[in-house]
Amino acid sequence: MNLIKIAMLSVLSFCSALLAQAEPNINGESGYINMPSGRIEADGTFRMGYSFAKPYSSIWSSITLLPRVELYARYVRIMGIPGFANNSAYGDYKDKVASGKVLLLEEDWDMPSLAFGINDVQGTGLFRSSYLAASKQFGALDATLGVGTGRISGAFAGARYTPAEWGGVALVVEYDANNYKQDKGATQTGVGQRKKGIGLAVDYRWGWLGSQLAFRDGKPGINAYASVPLEAKEFIPKLDEPAPDTEVMVRPSLEQWDTDPQYRRALIERLLKQDFKNIHLKVSGHVVEATLTNTRISLASRAVGRAARSILLRAPLGTREIRIHYTVSGMPFATYTFFDAERLQRYFNGLESRKQLAPYVAIDYAEPQKSAGSEAILDGLEQEYFQTHLDSNEGDIVSFRGEGAGLDKIRVAPGLGIYFNDPSGAFRYEVFANAAIEKQAGTGLFLKATTQLTVNQNVSGVTNPSNSLLPHVRTDVADYKKNGNVKLTQALVNQFFHPEQRVYARASAGLYEEMFGGTGGQVLYYPARAPWAFDVSVDALKQRNVGGWMGFRNYSTTTALAALHYRLPISGMTATARTGRFLAGDLGTRLEMKRRFRSGFQVGAWYTLTNGNDITSPGTPAKPYHDKGVFMSIPLGSMLTKDTQPTPRIAISPWTRDVGQMAASPGDLYDIMEPVYTNMRDRDGLQYFGDLDDSYDQPRKPTVVDRIQWANWKEDRSHVLDGLTSADTWLQVGMGLGVAALSGSLDKPADRWAVRHTGSRFSKAVAGVGNNLPLAAGGIAGLLALDDSDQRRSAASFTALEAGLVGMLASEAGKYVVGRSRPQAGMGSSDFHPLRSSNDAAGFPSGHATAMWAMVTPYAKEYQTPWLYGLAAVTNLARVADRQHFVSDTVG
């Protein structure tokens, strides 16, 4: 009987766990009101919202970037605290906060979900905290217990009651453990009087939309947001999408095709009506070749499928094979060969599946000069076919477009620019109209010009000049925005080349962008099968005058960047490293990481490390500023009733600085080719080929993340408990404490040495390298863990990540228990204040050193490379030289 009860409870608990919701708190992280939970949202969920709880208001966003990783960002306003003492125009103080959470354990019938999170990891650190939270579902009740350090000080709890019959309404209660006294301006705003306590709220969720009305100490707070599943294949049905070509025609014989040009012309006209451009046809015996591109349909495989339909309906009788060379910017990129035309027709007729068709299709990189000989017919259609459109089909409120049978086009559309965080005002904007014309003047040769008419703007209110000590390659941007209502923003000549299979090149000259013009070029190489691409770009540039016309400033520079793009073995992830010389003459590397979701949205971030030494605010001599930011590419076709290619890109950087900057490319080859490359490498390369979502029988290849035995973590609990009770473990702990105690004799002399050498070249170099080694080691271990080409290395790398995370958690716990002051506090090495809530900033043990040693140990043992411990010791030296820790902190 007891076994039956246990089984019933297990099934009930498991089923209820499936209903668990990960709703956002006022900071945007999955949680309750102010506190986080031990959950994260479903993979690919993007949320954006606004919250207000006096004195704070936030515009926030969050995304589940990976199946177990949730990231958050918010722009916080603190009411009643001036941003600048001598500048009332800026208004209240504002701060940018970046946070993240990792799901360590998924919920099971006997285990809660467990998550570790860090808040405010970059910037001012005003809201910095770290926490561990466990959540469990009990029917309609979701409950959380957790503990935090920093702003979240000590134990916290939360619960959400969401009965199905309430139709999206939920009741929320939490124990708020925030230490509001440490908040900026806590005395002036009155929030410093707020103590830890109970908060209550009512939630309402309707589809993608959600809201919360909360009360804390009798004061209301609100949170409203939208939640978008980026892993959905589409958001809006394509109600206005033109149907595929099904017009039945009398097909000519091969002799009729060769002698009567009307058949070629009819096929080209039919393709033109479906937005195909630069069409060239060639028939050789039983083989039909077509070279073309499509300017509307977003997936190359879908465009090729539509072209193949029309060719089958109008090709000569007896056609056995069809080859379609799909071009990008006039360059053939992918060749689709259909070896069995009859089987292809049966697929379009619904008589065969895509799985049956796929073995008879070859997709490869195109050879150079793969175009056919119907130029005369195409030239005759150029003037006849030129069409104009006035509509919103490309995602604009309205746009005027003109296009012909080639790649010539005219476009007039409105635009909006937004700028944050200038000291003379937090929000600046400009509304404008862009007029662009592009002309294909020859094979791969394009002429392009863009003008801008500013309709309205308040950028001219920017009064603070740039304080940058570097060449003002970006920080003078406000001068460019506010001078001249009519501007020539771009005037270019681009020549594209395709010298070899998988090799592409570009030569450019003219006005690249609003701030720079010059000459340059780029070469891109794709290997035959490897998941990476490599390009080199070199540009000789001169800075333009403000006003937007042909004048130039005296500043000239040459940028030279080599870029490696690597597609990680996890769905949609790409890592890019760009190394070389940037706009301000600084040398270094820009690291980028992004993920492409099934909807076509791309979300990513960048971080740049150069020798630019930007020490003006927000940088300091001790901590120079490094350019960083986040970006999102938005495929407008996913939000319209008709497919379209335009994909605007939004990029947000905390500050506009001159370090680590790049000029806008006249036509970045990798960006141009990436959509087609991604499409042709997506499983069998035939996504939506027949205008059908028929990939259900094409399961994605399991990734390393999929193969990780997360459940084994639960089984490891018994091993952990056994280890904690073993004599060997306590002997090792005792030896470690003994080493720390012995190293204590070095604390004072080492700190005196650090004081004497503060600011020296050696100290700066060691601190710069050693302080960043744990981050670099974690990043490298993460990439290697995802790379399944070497199972031994992948396993060691995942173990290193586990060890690093456990080391971080252990160091945080140790700081709380020991509470030792840091050298910079000036209290000496013997100042301890154990078990205090403020001990998150304590010194013993060093989190950097603990994590670094933990991460290198699995590699050192697996590959018998003890020299790696010397690399870890550099971090110890850096923490001491930077006066962040005593010697014994780094070995304890």
Where are these regions (language model features)?
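Transmembrane beta-barrel domains of Gram-negative outer membranes and organellar outer membranes
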Residues: 21-126, 137-139, 165-169, 178-181, ...
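Long, low-hydrophobicity, solvent-exposed regions enriched in small/turn-prone and acidic residues
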Residues: 22, 30, 57, 62, ...
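Outer-membrane beta-barrel channels and translocator barrels
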Residues: 41-43, 66-68, 78, 105-109, ...
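Transmembrane beta-strands of outer-membrane beta-barrel proteins
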Residues: 46-48, 59, 71-73, 112-116, ...
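Outer-membrane beta-barrel translocator/channel fold
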Residues: 73-99, 116-132, 137, 144-164, ...
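Short, non-transmembrane amphipathic alpha-helical segments
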Residues: 267, 298-320, 433-437
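Interfacial segments of alpha-helical transmembrane regions
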Residues: 786-810
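Membrane-embedded catalytic cores of phosphoryl/pyrophosphoryl-handling enzymes
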Residues: 789, 825-892
